[in-house]
Amino acid sequence: MKVQDKQHIRAWVSGKVQGVWYRNSTRQVAERLHVLGYAKNLPDGRVEVLAYGDTEAVNQLIDWLHDGPEAAIVTEVKTKQVEGETPPLGFEVC
């Protein structure tokens, strides 16, 4: 796979996304898609997601972030391309 076929993004997910298994569910979906990165709670109530992998797989994860698990109520997902960072080795819940 060529490097240009990979995508590295950071996403910030707003809404009712803490205390609803959002991070663990994100990890399960990411692992199924073979996407590397992390999901972590932020002090302001959002969840930050770092994702690296095949462009199509990362796009599928981003689509899933807009819905999340059943108990979540997602109001906004902002994404930004990541450049110059070393790709992660796995997918972690922080």
Curated annotation (Swiss-Prot):
Covalent S-S links between cysteines: none
Segment forming the signal sequence: none
Catalytic residues identified in the record: 23, 41
GO molecular function per UniProt: acylphosphatase activity
Pfam families reported in the protein's UniProt record: Acylphosphatase
Family under the similarity heading: Belongs to the acylphosphatase family.
Protein name from the UniProt record: Acylphosphatase
